[in-house]
Structure formats: C-alpha cells, structure tokens
C-alpha cells in the first residue's frame, strides 16, 4: 500500500545535510531497454521511455544497455548511460490518485535497472557500485525530469509532483563494461560523498532557502554539467553578505565603495557577466533596496560608484553619509541576458558609440576595459556638469573620449554623435547610452529615426528597475486555488514572470530556466503570450506558458498549481 508524499522541496529551508544511509547489497530484478518511437506519447512526442525487460544476459557498454536508445540529445551518452529508479515509489504514486494510476507500474519512468534496497535517499553522487561479476557503475546525477512525464502518465501534474517530491531516480556512468543479468547482485564499493544523496542534491538546488556553504559544496561534486551549472548559477545569484572595506570620493559627489565577501566561499567562476549590476540591500532601521552598476571586481570583491542624488529618497544619502568601513550589505548580481544576446547578433568589429551623462559612466567602465584589452573600437561622448563632478576621468583613454563640460558652455549634440547609415543602408556602429532620462530618450529617438535596429541599441536605465531588456512589461493576474490567493502584479522589462512570481512567494517550480524542460509551466486562463519556450506542445500554446522565458502581451490571467 502506497503513501502520498507530503514533501515539497521548493518550500524547504536546508541548512545542513545528514549522512545518507548505506544501502545493503541488492538484487537486480529487471534489465530494461527500448527503441525510439515516433508519436509514442499522445501521438505527438518522439520518445524511448517505453522499455522492455531482458531476461537473459545483456551487454552494458560505456553508453548503456545494449539495444537502448534515447530520443533526446540530453539523454544517454556516457554521462547518463544507465537510468535507475526505485520501484518502491510506484505504489506511492498510485496513492496520489493520478487520473490513470495503473500507468504507474515498474518501468514507467523509463529506467534501465530495477533493483532492491536502493533509493533516492541512500544512493549518493559519486557512489561506485559493482553489478554482477564485471560491471562498475558511478552515480552521476539525479534524473532531470521533463514535460514528457505529463504525457507518459496522462497527468498534467506529473512533472511538478516528481520535482516537488524528489522521486526522480538517478543516472550513472559505466566505469567498466560487461554482461548483466536479472538476479545479479549490486553492491556499494566506494562512497566519497556520504551526505550528498540523490535526494539531498535536489533539496539543495531547489530549496527556497539554502546554506551558501552547501551550494558551494554542491558545485564541487562529480556531477553532470547540467546539475553543476544549476548549482553554480544558484550560488552566483544568491544574495550574499559583504563588508565595506574601502570608501573614498572620486568626484565631488561620487563615492567609490568597495565591498568584500564576508564568508569564505568557493565559487567556480567568480567573474561577473557582461553588463552585470549589483542588487543591494542596506540600512539599519530602514532597509533600502537599490540597483547600481558594478565599476570593477568580481563576486569576491567589487566596487560601486554612487552619486549623491540631489533628490535622494534616502538610498544614496545613506551610502554617502552613513555607511562606514566594516558595515555590511547584502548583494546579489543582476544580469542582462538580452544585452549579451544582442552582442552575439552584432559584428564585433563595429565601432561602439557611447553617449553618457554624469554617473552613467559607471555602467560601461567594465565594458570599456574589456574592449580596450581586445583592441575593439569605441568612442565615448561624456557629458558632465563640471570637471569637479566628473567621476573616473583617470580611467578614460583621452584619445577615445570627448568631454562636454556644461559649466564651460559645451553641449553634447546627440544627433551629431550618432553615425548615420552608409549609402547602402548598412550601419557601422552600435549605440550605448546611460545617463539622465532626457538624454537617453533623445538618443533613442535619434537612433530610431535613423533606422537603427533594436539589437544595435543598448540603454542602461536603473530608474525602471535596471539592467535588462527581456521584453515589454506586462500585467499578470495570478490565482492560486490551493491557498485562495489572488494577486495582480507587473512584470518589468528586466525580469521574467518566474522571477516576479517567486519574489512574491508563489514558489513556482523551475529547473532549466531556458524554456526547455517544462518545470515552470503555469496555466493560462486569459491573454496573449509571446512564446519563446520549446517545451510546450502545439496544443498547449494558448492554454499554458513557461514562466521562465514566455512573456505576456498586455495583460494575462494565470493559475498556479
């Protein structure tokens, strides 16, 4: 008799991990393999999830069981050669009252191996098992479930329930090949990571709150790139505590603040992405949340240039007048994937024309250093009130900078600074701008009148949330029947629907965050969608969307399971 699971990994707080129990030697009950079938799931999906038993000996090669095929490039290969699933889960699935409980039978998850005594709780990453007389297997990752499970079990909640419960199974590498057969013994030989069970890995990468040290440990496990990248990205993007280690004026009203990470962490790639910005929380009694351009540094140690706003709501005044050496802030790095995508679309040899006003110079200092090191062409048009108020002048190459000093009667002519297209209609420059809203608006107007395509224009505007251009803003009405919660929210240009929903505490599941796995699918009740995801079936479009990449047009109404 099965038991309905109450586990919900995305709502957990994980601060420590217990050592996983050691599995006793088990018996191989089934060996399964299957061929690719077109239209196997609901007549629409090509899959090899339907596998048949092999009663006699079968060869297990470096890429898995002989005769087993994989329809997706993300399945199979040497890193995911063999899939195993705990057969004890099937009665528990039937206890969840899915529409067709009989579909939850041994083999239904597409597993190659069915054994006794092994589970998500007692199998660890890096474990090495001996199967039969010859074969050695190494656990490489939890199974990464996808939208096909919904079709396999004819249950729209199948994928989400698999993620929430952590009953996903695991994949293995074949370290030593050989024949395997029903009745063989499988036993644990080595366990280098005793607390990193398959379930614990999922808990750490999916939990609402998780220790940064655990995330850092997770990035060092011998897992597949898919799960390592998920752990690395979560570690990089998580809010971290920093200490102010240096502060000084670099202009009359600009204070350069340098922060160092408080707790030691191992971060595989500490460099910030291009066009990254800092999302900071600071203050004592009153907490401020602001976004600032990152002047230099990496996740371990970075600097901001903060201008004292004459009309400050308290944020810049606090950072100038109250923040002292040794004080702490929280920072999480923001990214601008739209800008990086535009970089990829443009010829790298194009001249970059920067139109900047005042403190807007901080938005492009890292980019200019990068272009300088690569020998890429650029020219900066920098409008300032006076030399005394101009920040970071010592970092600007004189031969690539034109200053416009208002106190000396000089004015930046934006229409003259933006190059016109060639006689054949080609554009030889990209336009970058950051500064007062009036300057950026004029820059955009001139560029549009000249016919510049959107991917050749880059505007940094933290006044609207800052640092991104994922698409047009839209409104979303959210219903959550389980909690009787109803909210109406705005999704800004620099955030995804997934970001906004989870920031509001809706706990929407996610996995790949690229629109390919189906984990963050939400039901569409009303409205039009700009679809960018690949996981939805044709018949699902208009009825659902992927919160990580799909965007509403105008206003949406959605329902969250």
Curated annotation (Swiss-Prot):
Residue ranges annotated for the 2Fe-2S ferredoxin-type domain, each copy included: 474-561
Residues binding [2Fe-2S] cluster, per UniProt: 512, 517, 520, 548
Keyword Iron-sulfur: yes
Alphabetical UniProt keywords: 2Fe-2S, Flavoprotein, FMN, Iron, Iron-sulfur, Metal-binding, Oxidoreductase
Region (Disordered), start-end ranges: 1-26
PROSITE patterns in the cross-refs: 2FE2S_FER_1 (PS00197), 2FE2S_FER_2 (PS51085), FAD_FR (PS51384), MOSC (PS51340)
GO molecular function, one term: oxidoreductase activity
Residues holding FMN: 288-289, 305-307, 313-316, 362, 514
Domain annotation MOSC: ranges: 52-189
EC number from the UniProt entry: 1.-.-.-
Top-level lineage group: Eukaryota
All residue ranges annotated as the FAD-binding FR-type domain in the record: 237-342
Cofactor: FMN
RNA-binding as UniProt keyword: no
Group of enzyme by EC: oxidoreductase
Family recorded in the similarity comment: Belongs to the PDR/VanB family.
Other facts: Fusarium verticillioides possesses 2 unlinked loci, FDB1 and FDB2, necessary for detoxification of antimicrobial compounds produced by maize, including 2-benzoxazolinone (BOA). The FDB2 cluster arose as a duplication of the FDB1 cluster with rearrangement and expansion by incorporating additional genes.
Complexes and interactors: Monomer.
Protein name listed in UniProt: Reductase FVEG_12641
Organism annotation: Gibberella moniliformis (strain M3125 / FGSC 7600) (Maize ear and stalk rot fungus)
């Amino acid at each position: 008799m099965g038991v309905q699971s109450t586990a919900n990994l995305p709502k957990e707080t994980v601060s420590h991990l217990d050592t996983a129990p050691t599995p006793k030697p088990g018996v191989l009950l089934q060996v399964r393999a299957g061929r690719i079938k077109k239209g196997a799931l609901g007549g629409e999906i090509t899959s090899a999830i339907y596998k048949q038993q092999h009663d006699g000996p079968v060869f297990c090669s470096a890429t898995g069981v002989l005769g087993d095929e994989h329809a997706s490039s993300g399945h199979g290969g040497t890193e995911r050669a063999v899939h195993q699933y705990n057969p004890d889960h099937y009665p528990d699935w039937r206890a969840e009252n899915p529409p067709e409980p009989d579909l939850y039978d041994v083999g239904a998850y597409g597993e190659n191996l069915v054994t006794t005594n092994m589970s998500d709780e007692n199998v660890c990453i890096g474990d090495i098992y001996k199967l039969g007389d010859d074969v050695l297997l190494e656990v490489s990752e939890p199974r990464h479930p996808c939208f096909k499970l919904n079709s396999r079990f004819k249950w729209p909640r199948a994928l989400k329930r698999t993620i929430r419960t952590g009953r996903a199974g695991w994949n293995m590498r074949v370290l030593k090949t050989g024949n395997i057969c029903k009745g063989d013994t499988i036993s644990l030989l080595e366990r280098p990571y005793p607390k990193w069970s398959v379930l614990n890995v999922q808990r750490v990468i999916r939990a609402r709150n998780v220790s940064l040290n655990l995330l850092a440990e997770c990035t060092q496990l011998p897992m597949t790139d898919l799960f390592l990248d998920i752990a690395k990205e979560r570690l990089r993007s998580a809010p971290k505590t920093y200490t102010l280690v240096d502060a000084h004026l670099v202009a009359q009203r600009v204070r350069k603040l340098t922060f160092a990470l408080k707790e030691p962490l191992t971060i595989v790639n500490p460099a910030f992405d291009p066009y990254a910005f800092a999302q900071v929380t600071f203050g004592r009694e009153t907490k401020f949340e602001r976004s600032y351009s990152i002047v230099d540094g990496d996740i371990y140690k970075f600097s901001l240039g903060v201008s004292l706003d004459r009309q400050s709501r308290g944020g810049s005044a606090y950072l100038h007048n109250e923040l002292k050496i040794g004080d702490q802030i929280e920072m999480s790095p923001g990214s601008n994937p739209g800008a990086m995508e535009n970089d990829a679309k443009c010829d790298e040899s194009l001249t970059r024309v920067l139109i900047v006003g005042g403190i807007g110079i901080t938005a492009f200092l890292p980019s200019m250093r990068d272009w300088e090191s690569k020998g890429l062409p650029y020219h900066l048009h920098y409008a300032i009130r006076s030399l005394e108020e101009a920040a970071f002048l010592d970092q600007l190459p004189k031969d690539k900078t034109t200053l416009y000093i208002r106190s000396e009667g000089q004015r930046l002519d934006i229409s003259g600074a933006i190059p016109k297209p060639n006689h054949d209609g080609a554009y030889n420059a990209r336009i970058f701008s950051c500064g007062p809203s009036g300057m950026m608006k004029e820059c955009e107007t001139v560029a549009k009148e000249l016919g510049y395509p959107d991917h050749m224009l880059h505007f940094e505007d933290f006044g609207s949330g800052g640092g991104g251009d994922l698409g047009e803003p839209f409104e979303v009405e959210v219903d959550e029947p389980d909690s009787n919660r109803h909210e109406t929210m705005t999704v800004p240009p620099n955030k995804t629907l997934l970001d906004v929903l989870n920031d509001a505490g809706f706990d929407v599941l996610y996995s790949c965050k690229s629109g390919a796995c189906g984990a963050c699918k939400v039901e569409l009740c009303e409205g039009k969608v700009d679809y960018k995801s690949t996981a939805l079936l044709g018949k699902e479009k208009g009825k659902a969307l992927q919160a990580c990449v799909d965007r509403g047009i105008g206003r949406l109404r959605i329902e969250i399971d």
